[in-house]
UniProtKB/Swiss-Prot annotation:
Subunit note: Homodimer.
Enzyme class per UniProt: transferase
Name this polypeptide is given: 2-C-methyl-D-erythritol 4-phosphate cytidylyltransferase
Site (Positions MEP for the nucleophilic attack): R157, K213
Highest taxon of source: Bacteria
Gene Ontology molecular functions: 2-C-methyl-D-erythritol 4-phosphate cytidylyltransferase activity
InterPro entries in the record: IspD (IPR001228), IspD/TarI (IPR034683), IspD/TarI_cytidylyltransf_bact (IPR050088), ISPD_synthase_CS (IPR018294), Nucleotide-diphossugar_trans (IPR029044)
Record's function text: Catalyzes the formation of 4-diphosphocytidyl-2-C-methyl-D-erythritol from CTP and 2-C-methyl-D-erythritol 4-phosphate (MEP).
Catalysed conversion reaction: 2-C-methyl-D-erythritol 4-phosphate + CTP + H(+) = 4-CDP-2-C-methyl-D-erythritol + diphosphate
Family the entry assigns: Belongs to the IspD/TarI cytidylyltransferase family. IspD subfamily.
Organism placement in taxonomy: Bacteria, Pseudomonadati, Pseudomonadota, Gammaproteobacteria, Enterobacterales
Organism: Klebsiella pneumoniae subsp. pneumoniae (strain ATCC 700721 / MGH 78578)
Enzyme Commission number, as recorded: 2.7.7.60
GO biological process, one term: isopentenyl diphosphate biosynthetic process, methylerythritol 4-phosphate pathway
C-alpha cells in the first residue's frame, strides 16, 4: 500500500507558548513520562509508514527543540514559525514542495490513535478536498450573552462537532487557501477554516474524543492517563 500511496507529509506548528498552562516552559515541551508532549505528538504521525516527512515549525530562537532526540531524526525538518498559527503552517508547507497531501497536527495533542490517523489518511483516495478528525458534541451547549456569563440561550447540538487534528488536505489547495485568507484578513482558527473561507467543504472524520489538546494545567494529567492506558492496551 505504501508504494502506491500518494506523497504524504506533515506539518506540526510548535511556535506557540500556551500561556493558559501557567508555566514558564512552552506547553509542547512539558513532559509526560519520558517524552515531551511534542515528541508524543510527532511519534504518533511517524508511526504510520505512509507519512514520509514531518516539518516542525518552532519559534525563532527556540533552544529547546535542538536538545530533543527528535531533532536528529532523519524524517524531521525544523523551520522557523511565525507570529500566528497560519504563518507557521505556511512556513512548514514551503519546506514540503514534494508533498501531494499534508497533515497538520497540533504540537500539544499527544494522544492521537493510529486507527483514527489511518481513517483520515484514506481520504486522499476518495476526496479532492480532504478533511479533519472531529468528535460529535455530546454536552448541552449554551451561548452566553455578549461579554457576559449569563446564558442567552441553548444551542442545538445536532450537527455540531469538535474540530480535532490532524487535518488533512492537498498541499497546493491548503497553500492557496491559507494565503488568500491571510491576505484578505480572514480569521483563521484552524486549517479547515481557511478552506471554508474559500468555499470548500472538508469532510468530518469521526475520531476519538480522548485525542485531547493540552491547553490548561488539568489537561496534563488527563493526557498522561490516556497515554498510559493506551500503552497498557497495546501490551494486552
Amino acid at each position: 500500500m505504501a508504494a502506491t500511496f500518494p506523497g504524504v507529509c506533515a506539518v506540526v506548528p510548535a511556535a506557540g507558548f500556551g500561556r493558559r498552562m501557567q508555566t514558564e516552559c512552552p506547553k509542547q515541551y512539558l513532559s509526560i513520562g519520558n517524552k515531551t508532549i511534542l515528541e508524543h505528538a510527532v511519534a504518533a504521525l511517524l508511526a504510520d509508514a505512509r507519512v514520509q516527512r514531518v516539518v516542525i515549525a518552532v519559534s525563532p530562537g527556540d533552544r529547546r527543540f535542538s536538545q530533543l532526540p527528535l531533532a536528529q531524526h532523519p524524517q524531521i525538518t525544523v523551520v522557523d514559525g511565525g507570529a500566528e498559527r497560519a504563518d507557521s503552517v505556511l512556513a512548514g508547507l514551503q519546506a514540503l514542495p514534494e508533498a501531494q497531501w499534508v497533515l497538520v497536527h497540533d504540537a500539544a495533542r499527544p494522544c492521537l490513535h493510529q486507527d483514527d490517523l489511518s481513517r483520515l489518511l484514506s481520504l486522499c483516495e476518495t476526496s479532492r478536498v480532504g478533511g479533519i478528525l472531529a468528535a460529535p458534541v455530546r454536552d448541552t451547549m449554551k451561548r452566553a450573552e455578549p461579554g457576559k456569563t449569563a446564558i442567552a440561550h441553548t444551542v442545538d447540538r445536532n450537527d455540531l462537532w469538535h474540530a480535532l487534528t490532524p487535518q488533512f488536505f492537498p498541499r497546493e489547495l491548503l497553500v492557496d487557501c491559507l494565503t488568500r485568507a491571510l491576505n484578505e484578513g480572514a480569521t483563521i482558527t484552524d486549517e479547515a477554516s481557511a478552506l471554508e473561507y474559500c468555499g470548500f467543504h472538508p469532510q468530518l472524520v469521526a475520531g476519538r474524543a480522548d485525542n485531547i489538546k493540552v491547553t490548561r494545567p488539568e489537561d496534563l494529567a488527563l493526557a498522561e492517563f490516556y497515554l498510559t492506558r493506551s500503552r497498557h492496551q497495546e501490551k494486552a
